[in-house]
């Protein structure tokens, strides 16, 4: 590992010498770029991620000065991979620079891909507001490029984290829109009942029985096959338990559904929120009697 570090530093010094010396304008930067790439690779072999990231940033600068924009964007993306191991904020900043160049040269699919990656950095750091913002940008770019599946994946992430942040209306709109658009697609229509279920659960979190009742009617009009599903019955039974303010019934309905279709952590979190509201309402009424 020490040998790799020594080699990396030697390559970097040679690159600096090239950049500071005389030479034909274009070839000077091209020669330095070759050396910086070798330096970055050696730093990676030495697992010196911060130094590798810095070398890639210098490499990107060389490519920009020789007007190799695509290569510069790729160097920023490589820098991000290195910084990801030590500093996700710096990694996101590098990818943002890559995205700006890809937008400039019309590589919008690459821009979308890297916006999604930035979102995932923030997601792994549990910075959900920032993750939402970048998943939204990625979804918009994927949609413009007509990569519908990727756009849907990003929008579903937006809805998931919006609901976690109690932005229920935003989440509901996304789930309902995706359900609506999926109905006419043979590959996607089987996911419709799942999207309607998650939208319905966001309605439940608002603790508004009228809202969930109206939503259920709308969903059955939208997709007549939803009526006979376990998901539709589950939402209707939960709405009934909420209307009756019956915590025991609510718990039984959840247990029964979970025994047939295991609930993931997001759904469990949403249902716990609804249950807590029911408990709070029960305590409030006890205090009044």
Swiss-Prot record:
The processes (GO biological process) annotated in the record are: intracellular protein transport; vesicle-mediated transport
| SUPFAM superfamilies the UniProt entry points to | TPR-like
The subcellular location is: Membrane
* InterPro entries noted in UniProt: NSF_attach, TPR-like_helical_dom_sf, TPR_rpt
Placement of TPR repeats on the sequence: 112-145, 152-185
User: Cellular component per GO?
Assistant: cytosol; plant-type vacuole; plasma membrane; plasmodesma; vacuole
Task: Write out the entry's keywords from A to Z.
Answer: ER-Golgi transport, Membrane, Protein transport, Repeat, TPR repeat, Transport
SMART domains listed in its UniProt record? TPR
PROSITE patterns for the chain:
TPR, TPR_REGION
According to the lineage, what is the superkingdom? Eukaryota
Q: Quick check: keyword Protein transport in the entry?
A: yes
Q: What membrane topology does the UniProt entry give?
A: Peripheral membrane protein
Q: Which cysteines are joined by disulfide bonds?
A: none
* Leader peptide range in chain numbering: none
Describe its function.
Answer: Required for vesicular transport between the endoplasmic reticulum and the Golgi apparatus. Binds to SNARE complex and then recruits NSF to disassemble it.
Tell me its family.
Belongs to the SNAP family.
How it assembles, according to the record, is:
Binds to the syntaxin SYP21 and to NSF.
Q: What is this protein called?
A: Alpha-soluble NSF attachment protein 2
> Which species does the entry assign this protein to?
Arabidopsis thaliana
Q: Supply the gene name.
A: ASNAP2
């Amino acid at each position: 590992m020490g040998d790799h570090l020594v080699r990396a530093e030697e390559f970097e010094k040679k690159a600096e010498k090239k950049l500071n010396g005389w030479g034909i304008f274009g070839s000077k930067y091209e020669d330095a770029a070759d050396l910086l790439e070798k330096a970055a690779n050696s730093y990676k072999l030495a697992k010196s991620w911060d130094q590798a990231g810095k070398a890639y940033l210098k490499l990107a600068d060389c490519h920009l000065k020789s007007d190799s924009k695509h290569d510069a964007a790729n160097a920023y993306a490589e820098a991000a991979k290195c910084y990801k191991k030590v500093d996700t904020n710096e990694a996101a900043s590098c990818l943002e620079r890559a995205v700006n160049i890809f937008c400039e040269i019309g590589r919008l699919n690459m821009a979308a891909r890297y916006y999604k990656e930035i979102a995932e950095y923030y997601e792994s750091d549990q910075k959900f507001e920032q993750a939402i913002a970048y998943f939204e940008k990625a979804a918009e770019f994927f949609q413009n490029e007509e990569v519908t599946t990727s756009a849907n994946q990003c929008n579903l992430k937006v809805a998931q984290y919006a609901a976690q942040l109690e932005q229920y209306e935003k989440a509901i709109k996304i789930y309902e829109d995706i359900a609506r658009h999926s109905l006419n697609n043979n590959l996607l229509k089987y996911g419709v009942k799942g999207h309607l279920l998650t939208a319905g659960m966001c309605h439940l979190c608002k603790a508004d029985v009228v809202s969930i009742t109206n939503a259920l009617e709308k969903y059955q009009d939208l997709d007549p096959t939803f009526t006979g599903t376990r998901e539709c019955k589950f939402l209707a039974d939960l709405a009934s338990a909420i209307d009756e303010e019956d915590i025991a019934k609510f718990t039984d309905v959840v247990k029964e559904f979970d025994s047939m279709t295991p609930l993931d952590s997001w759904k469990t979190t949403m249902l716990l929120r609804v249950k807590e509201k029911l408990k709070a309402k029960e305590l409030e009424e006890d205090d009044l009697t």
